[in-house]
């Protein structure tokens, strides 16, 4: 029997949140889970499905989330946008590790201010692409380089793979901003989101109209890799698998430039593809984060601090897990 208190997944009855609950259950059958949401019936259905779980109603308008004083959790994973930040307040008030997935780069200030005021538990800022999956793969491949000069990331999300209503609302909110942040030659600057001519190349070579975007990878990777240029382009369109008449997938292409450990210099390309779309990748990113925050991997639990996925989770381990769960991650031919 697990000695851990339940892991609270707020939004756990939504499409990706439920996927994360199932993934965490698969990795750790004994860890209790609480499925939190506004609709008790939906939360109860997911809790019943995964087992060793309970359903709780969450009220984000209240600092106590509407929970009874006797409730306690080992960690909180936040799958919905919380414009009150009451879930983060609750986590800090109760010294509970917290993971947020829906905050934009232009919205992070209030979260950091709350954390700086009361840094009582670890806080994983998980709004990197697919919960940090892209950055974890980049750190894994960057180990082939002695120095990294630039990182270019291009994500192709299939238009049939938007997920549930909460995910669609997040997408609309995060992509309506007029400017996105990028690092070029060591200098931060804002770029027009709808910059003319931006395209994303699918893994079968098609040019898909895209836009600049700045998930948290853009400002975490310069720190973790030393890169002086980091850019992220995004497109919503037809993935290679669906173009072939198969179900949609999700695609991330990565280009790393710098001096390799074999003494050569140049640009290497890599591909990260999951044949079932973005949900299983994001879900596993969250499950690995919870695992590391709580020390479920046999190591000490994470200390209080601000973290990105690649500063918390061991990248090589994550890549192996992604592959085991169906992803293809490899250097491009």
Residue ranges and their predicted role:
Residues 2-21, 41-54, 72-75:
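Conserved N-terminal glycine/acidic-rich loop preference
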Residues 10, 14-18, 143-269:
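Active-site-lining helix/loop region of Rossmann-like oxidoreductase modules
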Residues 57-75, 83:
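Conserved Rossmann-fold cofactor-binding substructure of NAD(P)-dependent oxidoreductases
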């Amino acid at each position: 029997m697990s000695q851990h208190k339940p892991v609270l997944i707020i939004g756990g009855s939504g499409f990706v949140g439920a996927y994360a609950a199932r993934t965490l259950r698969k990795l750790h059958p004994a860890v209790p889970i609480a499925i939190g949401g506004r609709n008790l019936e939906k939360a109860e259905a997911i809790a019943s499905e995964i087992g060793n779980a309970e359903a709780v109603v969450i009220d984000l308008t209240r600092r106590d989330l509407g929970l009874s004083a006797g409730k306690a959790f080992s960690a909180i994973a936040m799958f919905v946008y919380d414009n009150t930040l009451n879930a983060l307040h609750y986590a800090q008030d109760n010294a509970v590790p917290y993971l947020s997935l829906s905050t934009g780069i232009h919205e992070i200030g209030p979260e950091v201010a709350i954390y700086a005021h009361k840094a009582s538990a670890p806080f994983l800022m998980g709004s990197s692409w697919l919960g940090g999956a892209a950055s974890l793969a980049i750190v894994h491949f960057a180990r082939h380089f002695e120095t990294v000069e630039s990182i270019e990331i291009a994500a192709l999300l299939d238009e049939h793979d938007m997920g549930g209503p909460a995910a669609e609302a997040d997408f609309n909110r995060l992509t309506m901003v007029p400017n996105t942040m990028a690092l070029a030659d060591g200098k931060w600057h804002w770029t027009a989101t709808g910059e003319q001519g931006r395209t994303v190349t699918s893994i079968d070579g098609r040019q898909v109209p895209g836009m600049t975007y700045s998930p948290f990878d853009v400002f975490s990777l310069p720190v973790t890799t030393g890169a002086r240029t980091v850019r992220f382009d995004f497109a919503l369109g037809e993935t290679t698998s669906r173009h072939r008449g198969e179900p949609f997938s999700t695609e991330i292409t990565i280009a790393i430039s710098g001096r390799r450990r074999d003494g050569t210099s140049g640009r290497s390309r890599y591909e990260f593809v999951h044949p079932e779309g973005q949900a299983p990748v994001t879900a596993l990113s969250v499950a690995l984060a919870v695992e590391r925050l709580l020390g479920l991997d046999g190591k000490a639990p994470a200390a209080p601090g601000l973290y990105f996925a690649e500063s918390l989770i061991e990248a090589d381990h994550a890549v192996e897990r992604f592959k085991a769960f169906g992803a293809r991650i490899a250097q491009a031919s």
